[in-house]
């Protein structure tokens, strides 16, 4: 059970980091021709 909990925390942390990285990289001045809702 402890292994499962560690695995879940690792996956959640990974996705949160990925989301934060993508959010910070999504600079409007970086992609002028690309528009995202």
Swiss-Prot record:
<comment type="similarity">
    <text>Belongs to the PsbI family.</text>
</comment>
<dbReference type="InterPro" id="IPR037271">
    <property type="entry name" value="PSII_PsbI_sf"/>
</dbReference>
<protein>
    <recommendedName>
        <fullName>Photosystem II reaction center protein I</fullName>
    </recommendedName>
</protein>
<keyword id="KW-0793">Thylakoid</keyword>
<keyword id="KW-0934">Plastid</keyword>
<keyword id="KW-1133">Transmembrane helix</keyword>
<comment type="function">
    <text>One of the components of the core complex of photosystem II (PSII), required for its stability and/or assembly. PSII is a light-driven water:plastoquinone oxidoreductase that uses light energy to abstract electrons from H(2)O, generating O(2) and a proton gradient subsequently used for ATP formation. It consists of a core antenna complex that captures photons, and an electron transfer chain that converts photonic excitation into a charge separation.</text>
</comment>
<dbReference type="GO" id="GO:0009539">
    <property type="term" value="C:photosystem II reaction center"/>
</dbReference>
<dbReference type="GO" id="GO:0009535">
    <property type="term" value="C:chloroplast thylakoid membrane"/>
</dbReference>
<dbReference type="Pfam" id="PF02532">
    <property type="entry name" value="PsbI"/>
</dbReference>
<keyword id="KW-0472">Membrane</keyword>
<keyword id="KW-0674">Reaction center</keyword>
<dbReference type="InterPro" id="IPR003686">
    <property type="entry name" value="PSII_PsbI"/>
</dbReference>
<dbReference type="GO" id="GO:0015979">
    <property type="term" value="P:photosynthesis"/>
</dbReference>
<keyword id="KW-0602">Photosynthesis</keyword>
<keyword id="KW-0150">Chloroplast</keyword>
<comment type="subunit">
    <text>PSII is composed of 1 copy each of membrane proteins PsbA, PsbB, PsbC, PsbD, PsbE, PsbF, PsbH, PsbI, PsbJ, PsbK, PsbL, PsbM, PsbT, PsbX, PsbY, PsbZ, Psb30/Ycf12, at least 3 peripheral proteins of the oxygen-evolving complex and a large number of cofactors. It forms dimeric complexes.</text>
</comment>
<keyword id="KW-0604">Photosystem II</keyword>
<feature type="transmembrane region" description="Helical">
    <location>
        <begin position="4"/>
        <end position="24"/>
    </location>
</feature>
<keyword id="KW-0812">Transmembrane</keyword>
């Amino acid at each position: 059970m402890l292994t499962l909990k560690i695995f879940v925390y690792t996956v959640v942390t990974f996705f949160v980091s990925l989301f934060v990285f993508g959010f910070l990289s999504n600079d409007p001045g970086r992609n002028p021709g690309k528009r995202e809702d």
